[in-house]
Amino acid sequence: MQIVILKNSAEVAEYGANIFKKQLQSKPDSVLGLATGSTPVSLYQGLIEANKLGDISFKEVTSFNLDEYLGLAGTHPQSYRYFMNEQLFDHIDIDKANTHVPPGDAENPIQACDGYEEQIQAAGGIDIQLLGIGRNGHIGFNEPSSGLMSRTRVKTLTKATIEDNARFFKEDEYQPHLSITMGIGTILDAKKVVLLATGENKADAILATVEGALTASCPASALQLHKNAVLVIDEAAASKLSDRDFYKHIEAENQKLLARLAKS
């Protein structure tokens, strides 16, 4: 894994946005894997601005989101389809017919999961997958104990995840306890994975992901198996890593090498 440690959340978002800009500039018809939650919002704002400036276009892009609450239609304000429309799709030149979010209101959720996998394969697979990470190391809604080669399926949310997400729901509002999520195996199939994490509350999860054992107890640890995974984290999220200066040194040397290769 490539570990990039930056000062704060603003730098994390900017770095992540630049990765996606370069992807779209080199391959305008990219298949993007997208995520929801508070962490990607600033990254999306950077992409919206770049699109308005004409630096990138989404006209040829196909996208697949990681997950969706089971039981919420896409028009529900707390659904992830609604979130993506508000935070990204409504503000860029993407064809919404090419944007895919697992159907939370599917009559047959199991069949819908199989269909989602088929859609990803039909699109040629995901070129670059954006991830956040939960306090317990979950990616997407792959909670601890998830199979490391799992595919898109229905998952029960842990109490910790339900509590973390409760802030998005009104006190008397129905909050789903089930979801449809890409599996860890589905995520690992992406050609590149970019995980963003900020804040001290993610430090334990980042420690387990980077330096811990490969285990279903920390789903994000599966990224140790990926040949092109980038973790972009701030100082707070990196605070429990054993040798932050070493990771920074590695990244600095990597950037020097890339700069030298770019000139040759």
Swiss-Prot record:
MF GO annotations: glucosamine-6-phosphate deaminase activity; identical protein binding
Transmembrane segments: none
GO biological process, one term: glucosamine catabolic process
Catalytic residue positions: D67 (proton acceptor), N136 (for ring-opening step), H138 (proton acceptor), E143 (for ring-opening step)
InterPro entries: Glc/Gal-6P_isomerase (IPR006148), Glucosamine6P_isomerase (IPR004547), Glucosamine6P_isomerase_CS (IPR018321), NagB/RpiA_transferase-like (IPR037171)
CC annotations in GO: cytoplasm
Catalytic reaction equation(s): alpha-D-glucosamine 6-phosphate + H2O = beta-D-fructose 6-phosphate + NH4(+)
Annotated keywords: Carbohydrate metabolism, Hydrolase
Enzyme class label: hydrolase
One Pfam family here: Glucosamine_iso
Enzyme Commission number, as recorded: 3.5.99.6
Recorded metabolic or biological pathway in which this protein acts: Amino-sugar metabolism; N-acetylneuraminate degradation; D-fructose 6-phosphate from N-acetylneuraminate: step 5/5
Subunit architecture: Homohexamer.
PANTHER family named among the record's database cross-references: GLUCOSAMINE-6-PHOSPHATE ISOMERASE
Role noted for this protein: Catalyzes the reversible isomerization-deamination of glucosamine 6-phosphate (GlcN6P) to form fructose 6-phosphate (Fru6P) and ammonium ion.
Membership in a protein family: Belongs to the glucosamine/galactosamine-6-phosphate isomerase family. NagB subfamily.
Protein's recorded name: Glucosamine-6-phosphate deaminase
Provenance organism: Shewanella woodyi (strain ATCC 51908 / MS32)
